[in-house]
């Protein structure tokens, strides 16, 4: 009985609650970083240095009346944000930090498959809103997400060839001698740009182009349901950065200090997340055709070439004696 309780309730909660807390403070860091980069303070009234701002925001969002457009589809309108957050939380299950909640043999494929399912929540929310702006935003988001998943999948394939396994724990063993970032830096650069596009962040935030589409697919959402979308988006940002840290900046395990493993990994993920915010503060939005051109004309041929190269190299050099 206790074992079942641990597996189905306490373990997932021990993951979900810290992720939600991290998301809350990521929003605060984002506002602070953007503030200081625009030569202003950012939130600094609620609590010391604005530290309680995310709590105030959360309370404000959840006590607002959830307004629903009269012409919208009632079930789908509420199901979409719930699905978005559920997927965002489930994605954390196979992450090795240092031990995953569910030790999956195909952890990477699980993450790729579930992140593809997020498309349905976006499309559902845009369609259920029964608003032309929401629908245009949703269609843009879906096209962008699907396009960049192609390059993400191919980059993952190359990286899997490096590590020789689909489990995320193998990456720590692979990178004990050297970070994969160093031999595979073009892949790492393309991976990072693709994660920016995959999570709909600036400079690829065409789905939320305030100047054109009001707010994108979540334009009709307010209060609680909007907060769920918001949490899902930021949880995905943290997940993608943690994944980038595992894949390219791995080997967080220091043999004589195993306690530092999680701190090590999370520090890398936090630095990558701050880089996300820095990119947002620095770059203007892409034009839609440039966004698509980048992935289909630049990333796709390059990643395909890398997959071929990394597959062919060990086979071509297999006949050489190891002394060389």
Swiss-Prot record:
What EC number(s) does the entry state?
Answer: 7.1.1.2
- This protein's record includes keyword Electron transport: yes
Q: Which GO terms describe its molecular function?
A: NADH dehydrogenase (ubiquinone) activity
Q: What is its main location?
A: mitochondrion
GO terms for biological process, alphabetical: aerobic respiration
Q: Which InterPro entries match?
A: NADH_UbQ_OxRdtase_su1/FPO (IPR001694), NADH_UbQ_OxRdtase_su1_CS (IPR018086)
Subcellular location per UniProt equals: Mitochondrion inner membrane
Which residues are listed as membrane-spanning? 9-29, 75-95, 106-126, 146-166, 177-197, 228-248, 259-279, 299-319
Q: Main EC class of this protein?
A: translocase
Catalysed reactions, semicolon-separated:
a ubiquinone + NADH + 5 H(+)(in) = a ubiquinol + NAD(+) + 4 H(+)(out)
Keywords noted in UniProt: Electron transport, Membrane, Mitochondrion, Mitochondrion inner membrane, NAD, Respiratory chain, Translocase, Transmembrane, Transmembrane helix, Transport, Ubiquinone
Q: Which domain of life is it from?
A: Eukaryota
Q: Does the keyword Iron apply?
A: no
PROSITE patterns for this protein:
COMPLEX1_ND1_1, COMPLEX1_ND1_2
Q: Name one GO cellular component term.
A: mitochondrial inner membrane
Membrane topology annotation: Multi-pass membrane protein
Function recorded in the entry: Core subunit of the mitochondrial membrane respiratory chain NADH dehydrogenase (Complex I) that is believed to belong to the minimal assembly required for catalysis. Complex I functions in the transfer of electrons from NADH to the respiratory chain. The immediate electron acceptor for the enzyme is believed to be ubiquinone.
Q: Which HAMAP family match?
A: NDH1_NuoH
Which family, according to the similarity comment? Answer: Belongs to the complex I subunit 1 family.
What name does the UniProt record give this protein?
Answer: NADH-ubiquinone oxidoreductase chain 1
Q: What's the name of its gene?
A: MT-ND1
């Amino acid at each position: 009985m206790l074992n079942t309780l641990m597996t189905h309730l306490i373990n997932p909660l021990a993951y979900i609650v810290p992720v939600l807390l991290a998301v809350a403070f990521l929003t605060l860091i984002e506002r602070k970083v953007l503030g200081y980069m625009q030569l202003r303070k950012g939130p600094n009234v609620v609590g010391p240095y604005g530290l309680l701002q995310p709590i105030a925001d959360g309370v404000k969002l959840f006590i607002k009346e959830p307004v629903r457009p009269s012409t919208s589809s009632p079930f789908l309108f509420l199901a979409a944000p719930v699905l978005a957050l559920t997927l965002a939380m489930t994605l954390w299950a196979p992450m090795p930090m240092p031990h995953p909640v569910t030790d999956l043999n195909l952890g990477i494929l699980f993450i790729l498959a579930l992140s593809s399912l997020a498309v349905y929540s976006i499309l559902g929310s845009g369609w259920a809103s029964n608003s032309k702006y929401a629908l245009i935003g949703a269609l843009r988001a879906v096209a962008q997400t699907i396009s960049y998943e192609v390059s993400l999948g191919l980059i993952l394939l190359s990286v899997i060839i490096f590590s020789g396994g689909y489990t995320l724990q193998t990456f720590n063993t692979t990178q004990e001698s050297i970070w994969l970032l160093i031999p595979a830096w073009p892949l790492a650069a393309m991976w990072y740009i693709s994660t920016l596009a995959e999570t709909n962040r600036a400079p690829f935030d065409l789905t939320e182009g305030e100047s054109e589409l009001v707010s994108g697919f979540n334009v009709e959402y307010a209060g609680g349901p909007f907060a769920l979308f918001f949490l899902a988006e930021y949880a995905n940002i943290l997940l993608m950065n943690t994944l980038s840290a595992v894949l390219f900046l791995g080997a967080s395990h220091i043999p004589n200090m195993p306690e530092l493993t999680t701190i090590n990994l999370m520090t890398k993920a936090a630095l990558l997340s701050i880089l996300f915010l820095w990119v947002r503060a620095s770059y203007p939005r892409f034009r839609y055709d440039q966004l698509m051109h980048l992935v289909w004309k630049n990333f796709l041929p390059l990643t395909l070439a890398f997959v071929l190269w990394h597959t062919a190299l060990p086979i071509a050099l297999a006949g050489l004696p190891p002394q060389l």
